[in-house]
């Protein structure tokens, strides 16, 4: 190459280097000119072309131009917006799904709550049926034991008579044989050996029949099973000291009807029990069976007194024997005293009264024998009454027992008279009542009592519906339990026992089978089947006018709610107390309390009528009684003979 050629090359490189460093628009771009399609609008990017969008040190020589950068930003923005829209739609779907799930959860929760409620109701019905079944089983066992005792006595009697017949035949044959040749008249006697053989076979067959008594399933054993099942149905209440009756406690706890609070009161039992005199205390089972067993199953009976011996002794005064039930076996008890329903109002004596058939031992773990009916007074320990606080249940505020009969048959220690908390079927709240467990088999719920006139019984219908008055643990006080509570206790067939006492100390009683209707039916009293010594005042009424004085089927009437049959006025207003009144009355135990007994109606303004505490068939309408008591007890399951 010549010198001239080298010079031209150097000049060209110098120019190119200068153009590169100047950055002028007129200089040549290293990337060269861009191709522009005919459809593109170049003017829209003209401003960006003059703008330095990047630095050489950062991007290098391939830095994109303004139009390309704008396109990339636009594409990125669209992609971001698309993602935002997609996320927004997903969020909306999630919100909708959450709403649906919440609604489904609410519906499932409602169904679950309903299932739990239905299960609680089913549990309540189940345990009520279980309780009824338990009582029926115990009752059937006692009746069966009574019948087995009868059969055993009949078998023994047949065996004894068979032996006597055989002995008489032998004696007769011997006597006739020894008379031959010495008697004025010859008698031929032939012993029927074939018949005797048949009698012996029949007697042997009867002796082979097993007539052993059933071991009675007492309620304590059932209570243990219920304790194990408390995870489904525990009884309500707190500690045993607050929720269960305490035997022998002398506190002034009182029965006032329905309780408004949720706490369970301490329950007291007095040391003495009110008695309406020498009442026949035999239970219905004892009166029906009316026999005594020939042997005792329990080992304790073998060492008992002559009243519980294995030999059967018929009382000369009563000509019958009573069946006395103990925990396991049936033992003999002979009545040695006067059996009468005309009784005196006396306190329970601690001394032995064998002439009246009443014996009481005052020991700590004694056995009461009243009219030769033995009751075990072992009330258990405080731990027996402890509830299972770890049990699972939604029903923590319900009482375990429905009435006094339920307390007697199921509650350990429930054989003592006193205050107990019960909850009849259908009741919304617990009810504190006085239970009489010593009269005619026990299980009686006190609903009315007059004894000193300290309480005014001329009250409004609402007061009679809710109840008023109190009694203590010993059963002293004046009380009207309340029509609503009485309806819950006697809306099914029940026995109503009316106990009366005059000012001379003599007493009488009347028992009826009753059913009480609800408020919509005016608490009408359906009454039938009278038995007792006080006279049938409720059904028969006054002899001169039975149709207008009978109380059967009558609604409850007060001075402010006149539902009686008298068209000329209000019987309740005239006679001074609410009652089941016709037009007007043969009995009213809620009348005006007059001291002394007999009274002159003409001296009792303003109406001058027989408005005392009366039972016309007992002492007449002009005699105001000193003490009265009305008690209810459910009718137990009848046994078809």
UniProtKB/Swiss-Prot annotation:
A long coiled coil structure formed by 3 polypeptide chains connects the central nodule to the C-terminal domains (distal nodules). The long C-terminal ends of the alpha chains fold back, contributing a fourth strand to the coiled coil structure. This is Fibrinogen alpha-2 chain. Gene3D superfamilies: 1.20.5.50, Gamma Fibrinogen, chain A, domain 1 (3.90.215.10), Gamma-fibrinogen Carboxyl Terminal Fragment, domain 2 (4.10.530.10). One of its GO terms (biological process) is fibrinolysis. PANTHER family: FIBRINOGEN ALPHA CHAIN, FIBRINOGEN C-TERMINAL DOMAIN-CONTAINING PROTEIN. Residues 1-23 form the signal peptide. One of its GO terms (molecular function) is protein-macromolecule adaptor activity. Residues 228-327 are annotated as: Disordered. Fibrinogen has a double function: yielding monomers that polymerize into fibrin and acting as a cofactor in platelet aggregation. The lineage of its organism: Eukaryota, Metazoa, Chordata, Craniata, Vertebrata. InterPro entries: FIB_ANG-like, Fibrinogen-like_C, Fibrinogen_a/b/g_C_1, Fibrinogen_a/b/g_C_dom, Fibrinogen_a/b/g_coil_dom, Fibrinogen_CS. Glycans are attached at residues 271, 397, 458. Heterohexamer; disulfide linked. Contains 2 sets of 3 non-identical chains (alpha, beta and gamma). The 2 heterotrimers are in head to head conformation with the N-termini in a small central domain.
């Amino acid at each position: 190459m010549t010198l001239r050629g080298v010079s031209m090359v150097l000049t060209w490189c110098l120019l190119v280097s200068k153009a590169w460093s100047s950055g002028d628009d007129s200089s040549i771009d290293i990337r060269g000119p861009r191709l522009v399609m005919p459809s593109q609008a170049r003017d829209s990017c003209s401003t960006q072309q003059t703008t330095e969008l990047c630095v050489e040190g950062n991007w290098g020589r391939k830095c994109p131009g303004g139009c390309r950068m704008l396109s990339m930003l636009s594409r990125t923005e669209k992609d971001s917006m698309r993602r935002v829209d997609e996320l927004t739609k997903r969020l909306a779907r999630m919100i909708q799904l959450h709403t649906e799930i919440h609604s489904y959860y609410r519906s499932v929760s409602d169904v679950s709550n309903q299932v739990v409620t239905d299960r609680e109701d089913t549990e309540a019905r189940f345990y009520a049926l279980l309780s009824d079944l338990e009582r029926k089983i115990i009752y059937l066992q006692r009746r069966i034991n009574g019948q087995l005792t009868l059969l055993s006595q009949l078998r023994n009697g047949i065996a004894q008579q068979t032996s006597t017949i055989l002995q008489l035949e032998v004696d007769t044959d011997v006597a006739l044989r020894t008379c031959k040749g010495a008697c004025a008249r010859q008698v031929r006697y032939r012993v029927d050996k074939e018949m005797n053989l048949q009698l012996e076979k029949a007697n042997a067959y009867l002796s082979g029949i097993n007539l052993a008594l059933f071991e009675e399933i007492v309620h304590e054993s059932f209570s243990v099973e219920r304790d194990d099942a408390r995870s489904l149905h525990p009884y309500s209440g707190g500690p045993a000291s607050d929720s269960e009756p305490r035997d022998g406690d002398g506190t002034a706890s009182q029965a006032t009807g329905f309780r408004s609070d949720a706490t369970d009161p301490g329950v007291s039992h007095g040391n003495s029990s009110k008695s309406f005199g020498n009442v026949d205390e035999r239970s219905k089972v004892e009166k029906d069976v009316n026999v005594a067993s020939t042997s005792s199953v329990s080992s304790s009976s073998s060492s008992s007194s002559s009243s519980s011996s294995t030999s059967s002794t018929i009382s000369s005064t009563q000509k019958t024997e009573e069946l006395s039930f103990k925990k396991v076996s049936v033992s003999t008890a002979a009545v040695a005293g006067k059996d009468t329903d005309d009784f005196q109002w006396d306190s329970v004596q601690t001394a032995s009264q064998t002439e009246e058939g009443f014996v009481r031992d005052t020991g700590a773990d004694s056995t009461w024998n009243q009219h030769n009916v033995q009751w075990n007074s072992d009330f258990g320990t405080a731990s027996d009454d402890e509830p299972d606080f770890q049990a699972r249940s939604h029903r923590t505020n319900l009482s375990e027992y429905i009435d006094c009969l339920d307390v007697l048959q199921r509650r350990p220690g429930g054989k003592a008279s006193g205050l107990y908390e019960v909850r009849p079927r259908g009741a919304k709240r617990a009810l504190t009542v006085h239970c009489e467990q010593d009269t005619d088999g026990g299980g009686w719920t006190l609903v009315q009592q007059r004894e000193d006139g300290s309480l005014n019984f001329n009250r409004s219908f609402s007061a009679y519906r809710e109840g008023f008055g109190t009694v203590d643990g010993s059963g002293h006080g004046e009380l009207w339990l309340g029509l609503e509570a009485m309806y819950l206790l006697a809306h099914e067939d029940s026995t109503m026992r009316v106990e009366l006492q005059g000012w001379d100390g003599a007493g009488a009683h009347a028992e009826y089978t009753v059913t009480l209707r609800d408020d919509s039916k005016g608490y009408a009293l359906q009454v039938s089947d009278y038995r007792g010594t006080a006279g049938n005042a409720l059904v028969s009424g006054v002899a001169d006018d039975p149709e207008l004085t009978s109380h059967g089927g009558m609604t409850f009437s007060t001075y402010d709610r006149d539902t009686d049959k008298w068209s000329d006025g209000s019987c309740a207003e005239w006679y001074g107390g609410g009652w089941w009144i016709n037009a007007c009355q043969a009995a009213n135990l809620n009348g005006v309390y007059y001291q002394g007994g007999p009274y002159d109606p003409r001296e009792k303004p303003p109406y001058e009528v027989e408005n005392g505490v009366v039972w016309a068939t007992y002492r007449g309408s002009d005699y105001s009684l000193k003490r009265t008591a009305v008690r209810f007890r459910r009718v137990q399951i009848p046994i078809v003979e």
